[in-house]
Amino acid sequence: MIVDCAHYVGGVRRHEGPLGIEEAASCARERAGFVWLGLHDPDPGELDEVGRAFGLHELAIEDARESHQRPKIEDYDGSFFVVMKTARYDDEREEVEFGEINLFLGPDFLIAVRHGIGSGLATARRQFEARPDLVRIGPAAAAWSIVDRVVDDYEPVAAGLENDITEVEDQVFAEAIGHDTTTQRIYFLKREVIEFHRAVQPLIAPLESLVAGTIIELDDAIVRFYRDVADHATRVDDQLNDQRDLLEGVLQANLSLIGLRQNEVVRSISAWAAIIAVPTFIASVYGMNFDDMPELGWG
């Protein structure tokens, strides 16, 4: 489904309403300005139509169709295919939801394909359109507005995970009694942190390559914006590494407390077994049928 499609010339949007795919491709071929096409969960036929209209590489189209790709940037004969993971923290369920954005970046176009939950791309477009200086730079600046939005949205997710980790840490050390349910929650949090790390970490190297100009030569005016995004992604990645280490420590502490609790139970059972063993032994001996027991006459 087309969410929005616009042709930008001279730093401004030329059309109020969204363009069709063929009309957008025709505008891109004019070599005046550029086209930004946004799609949300397109069907295979729609993606194929976009691919034909803009001359996109079939392998990139295949990746966009299947989704669930690792974050990456690939060069296809002068146009670039970018994969990013979107993330959103669900406060009610205390879970992280993931989606995906694929970008096709060419000299005269930017095509954004969103699968599942996504960042506020409509907001990113409005903010971009409010900056004619950025619009004049072209598709690379439009792509930055999306990448920046996606990475900005990582921060509240990391903060939500941080709160969950603090809660489970307080639960473990405040009660000083290990619980199997707590162990399950720690494992769940570890899995979410690892999955989030897999979304963030692979994005850092391509962003740094963009800044260094080894993938594509960017306008100097936009390089500093990409550098800021790369720094932001690195900070989030460092935070996730710290969270993973902290969760490992909390897990080991909880398992140790469970072990101590089990030892206490075993010692308690052993003590009661020893107490019960004495009268049981006496009763078992004197309950036997002996013809001669001399000690019964002592005293």
Functional labels for PLM-detected ranges:
Residues D231-G299:
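Hydrophobic alpha-helical transmembrane segments and their immediately adjacent juxtamembrane loops
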